């Protein structure tokens, strides 16, 4: 008869093996294949692909899009989390469900929504055309689509933190004469800064890797409205495999750097993060 400790050891080993095998097979192996394929013709060929004018345009557009969408979503996430966590009002459950909407709606549908609203034949198309404003097939449309698919990340990180924090500290600060901004800066922000940082990092990684929604609203204009994921598709369809994998490798490296930064911050400030959660 097996002892309970034997069963637990076997179960633990089996679960670890399954997890490691799954991660290795479906995550690490494809990632390694991407890097090896990018360097198949040497590092000079990979760098040449990254220096191509269309690749440079895609890189710049991706970074600009993330630089605009992420701060705006951070502001929205703070406001939405504050409203949901601190106040009770009619429609609160509906607002919470709407915050999660991008998790359940296909990014392609999100892109089509913006085309129907802002496209030349859309609801606002004639007005935009008369005022010489271009949203679809231009940077504004790409930013809007990216914001749609990424806006839940910051809010979802902050809502539980703000709910646990309560309102006592803010009310005490206001009673002592602090303004709303001072209360947020000195009381609320220190308690949510790690959740805010994690949400921003996840939002940034998702923004740079977004494909579906951006593909619909960008028009796929090579050298103008192609982001890095779209440029990878174009290169791959043109049988330029080394160039495609080179750009994909850069995109993967950006995501890896984001994860490494998150892990380093967790390790460096582990005690402070634990203290915030205990509080």
Task: Please give the residue ranges for each predicted region.
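Transmembrane-helix boundary motif in ABC transporter permease subunits
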Residues: 2-8, 46-49, 68-100, 112, ...
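C-terminal transmembrane helix and the adjacent membrane-cytosol boundary/short C-terminal tail
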Residues: 7, 14-18, 26, 33, ...
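Periplasmic/extracellular loop-to-transmembrane helix junction in inner-membrane transport proteins
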Residues: 2-13, 34-71, 86-87, 234-242
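Hydrophobic alpha-helical transmembrane segments of multipass integral membrane proteins
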Residues: 25, 60, 64-76, 80, ...
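Interhelical loop and adjacent transmembrane-helix boundary motif
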Residues: 9, 46-48, 53, 208-264
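Membrane-embedded alpha-helices of multi-pass transport/permease systems
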Residues: 28-32, 36, 75-80, 109-112, ...
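Membrane-interfacial helix termini and adjacent extracytoplasmic/periplasmic loops
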Residues: 2-5, 43-51, 56, 91-92, ...
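Transmembrane alpha-helices
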Residues: 17-22, 71, 97, 101, ...
